[in-house]
Protein backbone atom coordinates (compact mmCIF):
# COMPACT_ATOMS: atom_id res chain seq x y z
CA UNK A 1 0.00 0.00 0.00
CA UNK A 2 1.41 3.37 -0.93
CA UNK A 3 0.61 7.04 -0.72
CA UNK A 4 2.24 9.93 -2.55
CA UNK A 5 5.25 11.34 -0.74
CA UNK A 6 5.45 15.05 -0.06
CA UNK A 7 7.79 17.48 1.67
CA UNK A 8 11.53 17.10 1.75
CA UNK A 9 14.04 16.39 4.48
CA UNK A 10 17.71 15.59 3.99
CA UNK A 11 17.68 13.16 6.93
CA UNK A 12 15.29 10.83 5.08
CA UNK A 13 16.34 11.11 1.48
CA UNK A 14 13.71 13.35 -0.09
CA UNK A 15 10.78 12.44 2.18
CA UNK A 16 10.11 14.28 5.44
CA UNK A 17 9.24 12.47 8.63
CA UNK A 18 5.99 14.45 8.61
CA UNK A 19 5.06 12.80 5.29
CA UNK A 20 5.89 9.37 6.72
CA UNK A 21 3.76 10.02 9.81
CA UNK A 22 0.85 11.19 7.64
CA UNK A 23 1.13 8.02 5.56
CA UNK A 24 1.15 5.78 8.64
CA UNK A 25 -1.72 7.69 10.28
CA UNK A 26 -4.16 7.48 7.45
CA UNK A 27 -2.58 7.29 4.07
CA UNK A 28 -3.71 3.72 3.45
CA UNK A 29 -7.25 3.04 2.30
CA UNK A 30 -9.69 0.97 4.38
CA UNK A 31 -7.41 0.82 7.44
CA UNK A 32 -8.42 2.31 10.79
CA UNK A 33 -5.33 3.62 12.58
CA UNK A 34 -5.04 5.14 16.05
CA UNK A 35 -2.04 7.42 16.69
CA UNK A 36 -0.34 7.69 20.09
CA UNK A 37 2.32 10.36 20.60
CA UNK A 38 5.05 10.13 23.22
CA UNK A 39 7.98 12.47 23.82
CA UNK A 40 10.33 10.41 21.61
CA UNK A 41 8.12 8.11 19.51
CA UNK A 42 4.87 7.89 17.61
CA UNK A 43 2.92 4.63 17.72
CA UNK A 44 0.35 3.69 15.10
CA UNK A 45 -2.17 1.09 16.22
CA UNK A 46 -3.68 -0.88 13.38
CA UNK A 47 -6.25 -3.64 13.95
CA UNK A 48 -3.66 -6.42 14.30
CA UNK A 49 -0.30 -4.68 14.63
CA UNK A 50 1.44 -1.61 15.98
CA UNK A 51 4.18 0.38 14.27
CA UNK A 52 6.45 2.57 16.39
CA UNK A 53 8.53 5.32 14.77
CA UNK A 54 11.26 7.20 16.63
CA UNK A 55 10.91 10.99 16.41
CA UNK A 56 13.73 12.69 14.50
CA UNK A 57 14.99 14.54 17.59
CA UNK A 58 18.18 15.06 19.55
CA UNK A 59 17.68 15.46 23.29
CA UNK A 60 20.24 15.54 26.11
CA UNK A 61 19.53 11.87 26.88
CA UNK A 62 18.96 10.43 23.37
CA UNK A 63 19.82 11.13 19.76
CA UNK A 64 17.41 10.03 17.02
CA UNK A 65 18.45 12.88 14.72
CA UNK A 66 19.47 10.74 11.73
CA UNK A 67 17.87 7.87 9.87
CA UNK A 68 20.77 5.59 10.82
CA UNK A 69 20.44 6.45 14.52
CA UNK A 70 16.71 5.72 14.39
CA UNK A 71 17.39 2.38 12.69
CA UNK A 72 19.87 1.42 15.42
CA UNK A 73 17.45 2.53 18.14
CA UNK A 74 14.71 0.36 16.61
CA UNK A 75 17.08 -2.63 16.45
CA UNK A 76 18.15 -2.05 20.07
CA UNK A 77 14.51 -1.92 21.15
CA UNK A 78 13.85 -5.26 19.48
CA UNK A 79 16.95 -6.81 21.08
CA UNK A 80 15.98 -5.68 24.58
CA UNK A 81 12.24 -6.28 24.44
CA UNK A 82 12.11 -9.49 22.44
CA UNK A 83 13.66 -11.29 25.45
CA UNK A 84 10.66 -10.42 27.61
CA UNK A 85 7.91 -10.27 25.00
CA UNK A 86 8.91 -12.48 22.06
CA UNK A 87 5.32 -12.96 20.93
CA UNK A 88 4.80 -9.19 20.65
CA UNK A 89 7.99 -7.83 19.06
CA UNK A 90 8.19 -8.86 15.39
CA UNK A 91 11.15 -6.86 14.16
CA UNK A 92 12.27 -3.68 12.44
CA UNK A 93 10.55 -2.75 9.17
CA UNK A 94 11.58 -0.14 6.61
CA UNK A 95 9.28 2.56 5.33
CA UNK A 96 10.31 2.96 1.70
CA UNK A 97 9.78 5.36 -1.16
CA UNK A 98 8.30 3.58 -4.16
CA UNK A 99 7.38 4.95 -7.59
CA UNK A 100 3.77 5.49 -6.53
CA UNK A 101 4.43 6.71 -2.96
CA UNK A 102 5.41 5.31 0.43
CA UNK A 103 5.22 1.66 1.46
CA UNK A 104 5.83 -0.43 4.55
CA UNK A 105 8.49 -3.03 3.80
CA UNK A 106 8.87 -2.05 0.16
CA UNK A 107 11.97 -2.41 -2.01
CA UNK A 108 12.67 1.26 -2.71
CA UNK A 109 14.97 3.60 -0.79
CA UNK A 110 14.41 3.55 2.98
CA UNK A 111 13.05 6.84 4.29
CA UNK A 112 12.22 5.73 7.86
CA UNK A 113 12.36 2.73 10.19
CA UNK A 114 9.68 1.35 12.52
CA UNK A 115 9.44 -1.26 15.24
CA UNK A 116 6.70 -3.71 14.28
CA UNK A 117 4.72 -5.33 17.09
CA UNK A 118 1.63 -7.46 17.45
CA UNK A 119 -1.20 -5.33 18.79
CA UNK A 120 -2.27 -6.73 22.13
CA UNK A 121 -5.48 -6.38 24.09
CA UNK A 122 -5.53 -2.90 25.63
CA UNK A 123 -7.21 -4.28 28.75
CA UNK A 124 -3.84 -5.91 29.49
CA UNK A 125 -1.85 -2.67 29.79
CA UNK A 126 -0.33 -2.01 33.20
CA UNK A 127 -2.35 1.19 33.75
CA UNK A 128 -5.58 -0.74 33.17
CA UNK A 129 -4.43 -3.61 35.37
CA UNK A 130 -3.50 -1.11 38.10
CA UNK A 131 -7.04 0.28 38.16
CA UNK A 132 -8.15 -3.12 39.44
CA UNK A 133 -6.61 -5.32 42.10
CA UNK A 134 -2.91 -5.98 41.61
CA UNK A 135 -1.62 -9.17 43.09
CA UNK A 136 1.69 -8.86 45.01
CA UNK A 137 3.17 -11.56 42.77
CA UNK A 138 2.91 -9.23 39.76
CA UNK A 139 5.11 -6.68 41.52
CA UNK A 140 7.60 -9.36 42.53
CA UNK A 141 7.73 -10.73 38.98
CA UNK A 142 8.19 -7.26 37.53
CA UNK A 143 10.99 -6.48 39.99
CA UNK A 144 12.78 -9.72 39.03
CA UNK A 145 12.54 -8.89 35.32
CA UNK A 146 13.85 -5.36 35.90
CA UNK A 147 16.72 -6.63 38.03
CA UNK A 148 17.68 -9.15 35.36
CA UNK A 149 17.48 -6.47 32.67
CA UNK A 150 19.82 -4.21 34.62
CA UNK A 151 22.28 -7.05 35.18
CA UNK A 152 22.67 -7.69 31.44
CA UNK A 153 22.31 -4.09 30.22
CA UNK A 154 25.09 -2.78 28.02
CA UNK A 155 26.66 0.33 29.51
CA UNK A 156 27.82 2.81 26.90
Regions found by a protein language model. Name each.
Residues 15-156:
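Conserved ATP-binding subdomain of kinase catalytic cores across diverse folds
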Residues 8-9, 43:
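Serine/proline-rich low-complexity intrinsically disordered segments, especially terminal tails, linkers
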Residues 1-7:
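N-terminal acidic, proline/glycine-rich, low-complexity intrinsically disordered segments
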Residues 12:
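Short, surface-exposed ligand-recognition loops at beta-strand->loop->(often short) alpha-helix junctions
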